[in-house]
């Protein structure tokens, strides 16, 4: 089962926490769809800024959005000009007062989502999939990861039939709940179709093993 389930969802409440931090008795569905709309918009709008994750906190008619990114300068802009533009665009999607908090991801090589997006970008630039996977695995392990597994699925190398190839180095214990495993998914839009890229990154164990 550990092979199939989303590693972050599997560990929620154990060592991982939710990306949407709010509680609603009435308009739960409405707020959930609003969250999805905001996330999709930000992902598209800030695609080249290396956005790792987006956290949304809500309280009393206000929405605080935490954006974790590898390139905060691109989002903030000169004297915060870009942030103001972004706030106005987000205000159109929600009737709440929006606060933006930009946080830098100091080691993008240790962030599964950013690694997946990096591999996807390489595939779009027609770099051989094995080379792209190997390069990312090597650089991630160099930065101190305990293990990584990258899976590419689709018409690899323009082949007639789609297939799945994966490359792993180190340990990736999917069943161990105390194992801090980061998960990222990205899609490479190539001339042959879409290639899916999944990354599982093992950073070490969080809770000490019970004696």
Swiss-Prot record:
NCBIfam families, per the entry: rpsC_bact
Gene behind the chain: rpsC
Gene3D superfamilies assigned: 3.30.300.20, Ribosomal protein S3, C-terminal domain
KH type-2 domain segment(s): 38-106
Taxonomic classification: Bacteria, Pseudomonadati, Thermodesulfobacteriota, Desulfuromonadia, Geobacterales
One Pfam family hit: Ribosomal_S3_C
PANTHER family: 30S/40S RIBOSOMAL PROTEIN S3 (PTHR11760), SMALL RIBOSOMAL SUBUNIT PROTEIN US3C (PTHR11760:SF19)
Family: Belongs to the universal ribosomal protein uS3 family.
Molecular function terms from GO: mRNA binding; rRNA binding; structural constituent of ribosome
UniProt name for this protein: Small ribosomal subunit protein uS3
GO biological process, one term: translation
Known partners and oligomeric status: Part of the 30S ribosomal subunit. Forms a tight complex with proteins S10 and S14.
Entry superkingdom: Bacteria
Function: Binds the lower part of the 30S subunit head. Binds mRNA in the 70S ribosome, positioning it for translation.
CC per GO annotation: cytosolic small ribosomal subunit
InterPro entries: KH_dom, KH_dom-like_a/b, KH_dom_type_2, KH_sf_prok-type, Ribosomal_S3_C_sf, Ribosomal_uS3_bac-typ, Ribosomal_uS3_C, Ribosomal_uS3_CS
Keywords on record: Ribonucleoprotein, Ribosomal protein, RNA-binding, rRNA-binding
């Amino acid at each position: 089962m550990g092979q199939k389930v989303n590693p972050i969802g599997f560990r929620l409440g154990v060592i991982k926490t939710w990306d949407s931090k709010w509680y609603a008795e009435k308009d739960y569905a409405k707020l959930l769809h609003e969250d999805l709309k905001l996330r999709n918009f930000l992902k598209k709008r800030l695609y080249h800024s290396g956005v790792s994750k987006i956290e949304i906190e809500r309280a009393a008619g206000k929405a605080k959005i935490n954006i974790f990114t590898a390139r905060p300068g691109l989002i903030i802009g000169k004297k915060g000009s870009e942030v103001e533009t972004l706030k106005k665009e987000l205000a159109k999607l929600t009737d709440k007062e929006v606060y933006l908090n930009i946080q830098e991801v100091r080691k993008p090589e240790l962030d599964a989502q950013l690694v997946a997006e990096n591999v996807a970008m390489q595939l779009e630039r027609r770099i051989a999939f094995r080379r792209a996977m190997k390069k990312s695995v090597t650089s991630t392990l160099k930065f101190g990861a305990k293990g990584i597994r990258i899976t590419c699925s689709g018409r690899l190398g323009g082949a007639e039939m789609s297939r799945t190839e994966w490359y792993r180095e180190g340990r990736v214990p999917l069943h161990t709940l105390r194992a801090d495993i980061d998960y990222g998914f990205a899609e490479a839009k190539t001339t042959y179709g879409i290639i899916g890229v999944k990354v599982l990154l093992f950073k070490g164990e969080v809770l000490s093993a019970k004696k």
